[in-house]
Curated annotation (Swiss-Prot):
Its EC number is 3.4.25.2. It catalyses: ATP-dependent cleavage of peptide bonds with broad specificity. It comes from Helicobacter pylori (strain P12). InterPro entries: ATP-dep_Prtase_HsIV_su (IPR022281), Ntn_hydrolases_N (IPR029055), Proteasome_sua/b (IPR001353), Proteasome_suB-type (IPR023333). A double ring-shaped homohexamer of HslV is capped on each side by a ring-shaped HslU homohexamer. The assembly of the HslU/HslV complex is dependent on binding of ATP. Keywords: Allosteric enzyme, Cytoplasm, Hydrolase, Metal-binding, Protease, Sodium, Stress response, Threonine protease. It is an enzyme of class 3 (hydrolase). The gene is hslV. GO terms for biological process: proteolysis involved in protein catabolic process. This is ATP-dependent protease subunit HslV. The active site is at T5. Belongs to the peptidase T1B family. HslV subfamily.
Length: 180
């Protein structure tokens, strides 16, 4: 269902300093054809305090972004309260329950996956989350690199997405990364 991208979020602490990164590839696929190689599917929200990225239908993803950003603003940037209210509001609207998109949202303290069905999932370790067609490749690579390699966080995100890009035909290695 969510062919055409990979998004990876990574947060934690290194040397006593908290960090948060999100990265994504630039490929947009329509059926079996690549229509764009340098799309931007990540952005920062609420005065650069929250990072987000999407996978899935572009129009649906923009609906997700708009709704989430409105709620985030109303909660003054409180990510936890925002995802809870997002889920509650989502369940009330029949149209929204059918969106074919997912988002990762994170800040220095939390990382969540928001689905087009209104589900909110906190990353298992509250550290790494991935979505999209290459999400499992990127997640596996990021977990391995986090556990065994001593890479800077930005480099870990970049290398994990490169691995996904090498394996997933709907993901390329034209990678963009944002950080807090």
């Amino acid at each position: 269902m969510f062919e055409a991208t990979t998004i990876l979020g990574y947060r934690g602490e290194m040397g006593g300093k908290k960090f948060a990164f999100i990265g994504g590839d630039g490929q947009v696929t329509l059926g079996n054809c690549v229509v764009k190689a340098n799309a931007t599917k990540i952005r920062s929200l609420y005065h650069n305090q929250v990072l987000s990225g999407f996978a899935g239908s572009t129009a649906d993803a923009f609906s997700l972004f708009d709704m989430f950003e409105r709620i985030l603003e109303s909660k003054k940037g409180d990510l936890f309260k925002s995802v809870v209210d997002f889920s509650k509001e989502w369940r009330k609207d029949k149209y929204l329950r059918r969106l074919e998109a997912m988002m990762i949202v994170l800040n220095l303290d939390h990382i969540f996956i928001l689905s087009g069905t209104g589900d909110v999932l906190e990353a298992e370790d509250n550290k790494i989350a991935a979505i999209g067609s290459g999400g499992n490749y990127a997640l596996s690579a990021a977990r391995a690199l986090d556990h065994f390699a001593h890479l800077e966080p930005k480099k870990l995100v970049e290398e994990s997405l490169k691995i996904a890009g090498d394996l997933c035909i709907y993901t390329n290695t034209n990678i963009k990364i944002l950080e807090l």
